[in-house]
Amino acid sequence: MIGLDTNVVLRFVLQDDIGQSPRSTALFDSLSPQSPGYISIVTLAELAWVFDRTYRKPRNEIAVLLRGLLESNDLVLENHDAVAQALRRFDSSNADFSDCLIERLCASGGCSRTMTFDVGAAKSAGMVLL
């Protein structure tokens, strides 16, 4: 298994760098179920944030990207079930993916609720306003 940093995944998905994109594509092409790539929770959160804030991608494109990673047989995602649940909430709400992910990770860790000062996260991501 090979760990994949955010910038490697971005270069593969965006194909926007003449030097790095072909190298990331070659790496992704070499992945298989027997030798998968590993994507951490931090990488997923960074990907969603960069797509939203830097590239101004619409929510549906962010969801398609995340779903593609989640469903790939050549990738292992950290805490796959919590990521899938967070993506479902992201699809059905106005919450940021990071907020959905935080709430689902807390729930999978045994938390009865996740407290926040973020009014939007309390309304859309299932958190409780402190």
Label the predicted regions.
Residues 1, 103-130:
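Acidic, PIN/NYN-like endoribonuclease modules and their adjacent C-terminal/linker elements
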Residues 34-37, 74, 110-113:
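Short active-site oxyanion
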Residues 16, 41, 64-92:
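Acidic catalytic patch
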Residues 1-39, 54-61, 67:
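Short, well-structured N-terminal submotif of metal-dependent ribonuclease cores
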Residues 33-34, 72, 93, 124:
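Structured helix-beta-strand junction loops
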